[in-house]
Amino acid sequence: MLRNGNEGMSTIPGFSQIQFEGFCRFINQGLAEELEKFPTIKDPDHEISFQLFAKGYQLLEPSIKERDAVYESLTYSSELYVSARLIFGFDVQKQTISIGNIPIMNSLGTFIINGIYRIVINQILLSPGIYYRSELDHKGISIYTGTIISDWGGRSELAIDKKERIWARVSRKQKISILVLSSAMGSNLKEILDNVSYPEIFLSFPNAKEKKRIESKEKAILEFYQQFACVGGDLVFSESLCEELQKKFFQQKCELGRIGRRNMNRRLNLDIPQNSTFLLPRDVLAATDHLIGMKFETGILDDDDMNHLKNKRIRSVADLLQDQFGLALGRLQHAVQKTIRRVFIRQSKPTPQTLVTPTSTSILLITTYETFFGTYPLSQVFDQTNPLTQTVHGRKVSCLGPGGLTGRTASFRSRDIHPSHYGRICPIDTSEGINVGLTGSLAIHARIDHWWGSVESPFYEISEKAKKKKERQVVYLSPNRDEYYMIAAGNSLSLNRGIQEEQVVPARYRQEFLTIAWEQIHVRSIFPFQYFSIGGSLIPFIEHNDANRALMSSNMQRQAVPLSRSEKCIVGTGLERQTALDSRVSVIAEREGKIISTNSHKILLSSSGKTISIPLVTHRRSNKNTCMHQKPRVPRGKSIKKGQILAEGAATVGGELALGKNVLVAYMPWEGYNFEDAVLISERLVYEDIYTSFHIRKYEIQTDTTSQGSAEKITKEIPHLEEHLLRNLDRNGVVKLGSWVETGDILVGKLTPQIASESSYIAEAGLLRAIFGLEVSTSKETSLKLPIGGRGRVIDVKWIQRDPLDIMVRVYILQKREIKVGDKVAGRHGNKGIISKILPRQDMPYLQDGTPVDMVFNPLGVPSRMNVGQIFESSLGLAGDLLKKHYRIAPFDERYEQEASRKLVFSELYEASKQTKNPWVFEPEYPGKSRIFDGRTGDPFEQPVLIGKSYILKLIHQVDEKIHGRSTGPYSLVTQQPVRGRAKQGGQRIGEMEVWALEGFGVAHILQEILTYKSDHLIARQEILNATIWGKRVPNHEDPPESFRVLVRELRSLALELNHFLVSQKNFQVNREEV
């Protein structure tokens, strides 16, 4: 945050800054911290020791470019060199050695792992330390407990039982006396009694037998080990027993870490040094003292709020990468120890590099990181749907993951908004569904203190000194500091007009919201958007929307597809430029100079006598199959300055975010076609490519070696295939660039060798060879065919050849998709809908100047959803369109005066009506509404209709990827019923509820057909197709369908035999005919 010369002016921090700061901390501090922990590896038998030094480590530049890493499915990484020393007898060798590769963060704040962009999101966890709580049991008696949480997430509890004895519960089952625990940690009874405030309570409960157990540390350790490990009998104290207890309990559950030590000192008023990161007897005694005070002293009821951000910490990318580096060094230690043993067996002289060079050792580092990025829940595939998603993804915070909560067990309180989130975590932006409230997004001004893991928010300090100097100092407050300040909300900006000392303002103090005098205020928020994330800050008039709809809007903006011709919004909030800039989809000039030439692939810039080539992204596929493309925006010969936009990316216009289109909308019902959130659109949106988007799909095939040792072959010479299917292949058997391909066409021809079957040696095969000259094929055709819905233009073909037999071919196909019935569209206020009908433009309702409307929304979608912001936006958008203006409006403008939003909209509509001389734009009887006409009849509608220009997005949920049909296809081998899912070419299934619905109508014959003949009766389903086509009667089969046979087999597996008997109609005698 930078304070400018202008009073009260500040710049918004970079939105991707959090990821970059985290990675820089890992490189500068995390690597050194873990290398310092690396132990000296000694082999006393051979007088050898190996050591790594933390100082002077180096990272080389990556050997490949980002683009090559993506295309060739490689990891974008850098080689790490460390100083090492090897002492062998009297010989001392020092060498800088390579210990492996570390993935490097790119300019987007992401990593490229095996060719895929991945990002590590921040995890929010309970801080290590101690937490107290009191709760009532079933008898109404208060139970007091203290929970000690270690740095690794292990928990130990201190509790006082009904007999007023103090116990430490070290796991769910075992509990031990607090005196035994303290003695096992090294304190004797005298030291315990000297260091506590309630010695009489400590002395009241141990009997003579318990006092014997704590006479010495050894006896206490034996007692602790017996209860902790549930071991009976007489144990003898030994060093191995002590080491096992140290490893299983003290190292796992007693390591507080740097943050835990600070929290423990602060909570219990201790002064233990920060470098003592393990639990000490003094900590346990102080914690027990406090627990006794809560139980026996009246008035001490200080339960800890576990959901307060002061009791949480952020595990950023720095912490997670550092943990993995420590894990890799641990594996490296074991590998070096094994290598030392092998060296002496072979009797060769080692060097530091030869101890680390063996293949398995040198790839330990990169394999550890690749496993982490591939399997860790907080490592996600980078969302590249549009520039907004690229900016927002790295700012997510999640309570899920190892050591955190789970979607199924998290309580309502842990999901709820907490007052400490104010200005730190957005109260709106969270996922919908089972993880609601567990994943959030950082507010735009929030920053992470990477040392302590707290989230800080900036405020203006309003002190006497600052008032005299007439300047405002920005202070960053962590969650545990802002409890001591009176914080005024952002709407106190209106106080600049009047006498501030005489006014009262809403403020926050200790999680309560109050109204107090201005002179009592300590700090105030700096920006109206301070409480919201980027997604929430892009919603105009957000203060007029219900929070649930704002949540949907911030999520749906991330699903917007970049359109072929982007258009920036008429009504915005002002953050569009910063969001587009920080997404790095545009090309920004890094230095000033003059443009020499531009084309679709690169821009040549002359600067300080040097010619710089700036490559552009052209039709690159994103992780979500959208098209990433940069278009040059500077003409040849133009002089440019540093920071100027040279080329614009997808979904940006003029350096601003442009996710949708400004279209003319009307809020009215139309023949039921916009019932229940359906949307009626004009064919103009199709024919003029208003909502046309490009999508790129990737198809790949790999050659392999068969079990017989024969290699698969990519070729055009594929026997027994129609020439039509092979028409697009070149002489190598790969589809040509620029070809138009349809469903079923072959993209890459491939033959898999097979052992010749016996049929190739029988007489008929010899006859075929003699007469027709045909050779019996010994290869199986396994070509890459274009699946259903994949039609398009081939724009790129990549050959990746690791060795002569291992070849991978990737084909990229570009699809142009116009908007069609079934596509999903949405506004920026949670108003979403599916296209139900595309009307000819002459049939659409039209305005008084003859302009046909582009979209018709249902007006009933507004009052019940309470997202009135869309009405303000559409009316102001209409005025802006007529006046050729763009508006950037900050939220909560009612802080200046009442009804400020409505006054602004009406005044702009009135101005537009005056300038265009169209009185229908603003009619005082029904402002914002107008009489419009039915395009089919030319008659005016009965009621005036609200019309406006709204910014509508096309979402990635498109009908082309969802629509599916099947006549026949694959069946499940066991049940012989159609398989499930579009990807498997599956079919529909009459489930339980559908059967109930049919039973309700009593349609027995239809039910019988659906559940037997048409479904899983092998013979009948073939015959029923023929009978239906020719209009014959459906044949009746007596044998059971396949699913019934499965039931019989399952009963047999339970030793139950199922038989059936035929009963004669004449005399009802039973004939036992076993099937």
Curated annotation (Swiss-Prot):
EC nos: 2.7.7.6
Organism: Oryza sativa subsp. indica
Classification via PROSITE patterns: RNA_POL_BETA
Keyword Plastid: yes
Recorded family membership: Belongs to the RNA polymerase beta chain family.
Subcellular location: Plastid, Chloroplast
Pfam families in the cross-refs: RNA_pol_Rpb2_2, RNA_pol_Rpb2_3, RNA_pol_Rpb2_6, RNA_pol_Rpb2_7
Lineage: Eukaryota, Viridiplantae, Streptophyta, Embryophyta, Tracheophyta
UniProt subunit comment: In plastids the minimal PEP RNA polymerase catalytic core is composed of four subunits: alpha, beta, beta', and beta''. When a (nuclear-encoded) sigma factor is associated with the core the holoenzyme is formed, which can initiate transcription.
Gene Ontology process terms (BP): DNA-templated transcription
Key words, A-Z: Chloroplast, DNA-directed RNA polymerase, Nucleotidyltransferase, Plastid, Transcription, Transferase
Enzyme class: transferase
UniProt xrefs under PANTHER family: DNA-DIRECTED RNA POLYMERASE I SUBUNIT 2
Recorded GO MF terms: DNA binding; DNA-directed RNA polymerase activity; ribonucleoside binding
Function noted in UniProt: DNA-dependent RNA polymerase catalyzes the transcription of DNA into RNA using the four ribonucleoside triphosphates as substrates.
Transmembrane annotation, as ranges: none
Protein name: DNA-directed RNA polymerase subunit beta
Source domain of life: Eukaryota
InterPro entries: DNA-dir_RNA_pol_bsu_ext_1_sf, DNA-dir_RNA_pol_su2, DNA-dir_RNAP_su2_dom, DNA-dir_RNAP_su2_hyb_sf, RNA_pol_bsu_bac, RNA_pol_bsu_CS, RNA_pol_Rpb2_2, RNA_pol_Rpb2_2_sf
Entry GO CC: chloroplast; DNA-directed RNA polymerase complex; mitochondrion; plastid
Gene: rpoB
Catalytic activity: RNA(n) + a ribonucleoside 5'-triphosphate = RNA(n+1) + diphosphate
